[in-house]
């Protein structure tokens, strides 16, 4: 596999720093690095410095936070994007965007290959490779960690031997964070029976240390998307940042589950995602207020889980994803209103909701007053409603 110009998706971590030197040696190629900012808590000036010290010909920093929020996270909110009903798809959403930005740089430079630091056991290799194949099928894809066969200890030794600037040799956890979530893997997390140590968490306080008084938030939605919190209009990215802060301060947003990876095995995954958890529950509740029972069942049990599966499995480019979103958009144009949530010591409750399009009628729901069907109407309804079941039951005796 020949390549003279390689554009590497660069995080600044051990794998991709070693990859800069390895790619240069292996292929005799010029290596360019790209770091895409999707809201991760990194020192980007240090990452750039590290890239050049590792041998990059040129480093590119791309601020994609707004695009990530408005083109990726927004879709996840509309589609209640939770893989297996639990994981808010933070990493899965970011990888196609990062891959697309790497392809853009590769095109600008006239490169003949792109590279990434994913291993052969991870989901991210699929997400990256499939996106590149869709956008630029002519570009070669190189995944050094799938080729070189080095253990982590051997990577550290390689880095030391070549004088590479790596300062994370003894990390306890593997962390991946962005605007939408923070994932925590490795070390004690790999024991599915052990409670995650408190030092694994950064965005959320332990529920027992959260404030003794609850926090109430009123979230306003327009056509399925949040547009204001407590009456203050703001951008989606700002709303997410605010909810991450407020939710985390109340211990809301910790996720611990066994995940079915697309590469064929189960893994124990721990996440922090306060904003994602709050918006998921608030949005679904508003949908229940507005949508008809048939719309609700179709969206919550067909559209939403299918969409989450596609995104998790690296199929952002799958035509079905777009079709699912188009179907949902027809319903979401009515999902406007306000939802009031209560945050308290790690728990979240929706405690109020209203919408000009809500299907709820107090007159119909109130048992103490209002309209009642007549006895004759009730009997006729019950007779027709139960006919299928009762007919089958009688025939099967």
Curated annotation (Swiss-Prot):
Pathway, per record: Amino-acid biosynthesis; L-arginine biosynthesis; L-arginine from L-ornithine and carbamoyl phosphate: step 2/3
Assembly: Homotetramer.
Catalytic activity from the UniProt record: L-citrulline + L-aspartate + ATP = 2-(N(omega)-L-arginino)succinate + AMP + diphosphate + H(+)
Family: Belongs to the argininosuccinate synthase family. Type 1 subfamily.
Pfam families per UniProt: Arginosuc_syn_C, Arginosuc_synth
Domain of life: Archaea
GO biological process: argininosuccinate metabolic process; L-arginine biosynthetic process; urea cycle
EC number(s) recorded for this UniProt protein: 6.3.4.5
Species per Swiss-Prot/TrEMBL record: Pyrobaculum aerophilum (strain ATCC 51768 / DSM 7523 / JCM 9630 / CIP 104966 / NBRC 100827 / IM2)
PANTHER family: ARGININOSUCCINATE SYNTHASE (PTHR11587:SF2)
Binding residues for ATP: 9-17, 117
Localization: Cytoplasm
Residues at which L-citrulline binds: 87, 123, 127, 174, 183, 259, 271
Residues the record lists as binding L-aspartate: 119, 123-124
The protein, known as: Argininosuccinate synthase
Chief location: cytoplasm
Keyword Amino-acid biosynthesis found: yes
Cytoplasm listed as a keyword: yes
Signal peptide per UniProt: none
Gene Ontology terms for molecular function: argininosuccinate synthase activity; ATP binding
Keywords (A to Z) from UniProt: Amino-acid biosynthesis, Arginine biosynthesis, ATP-binding, Cytoplasm, Ligase, Nucleotide-binding
GO cellular component: cytoplasm
Enzyme class label: ligase
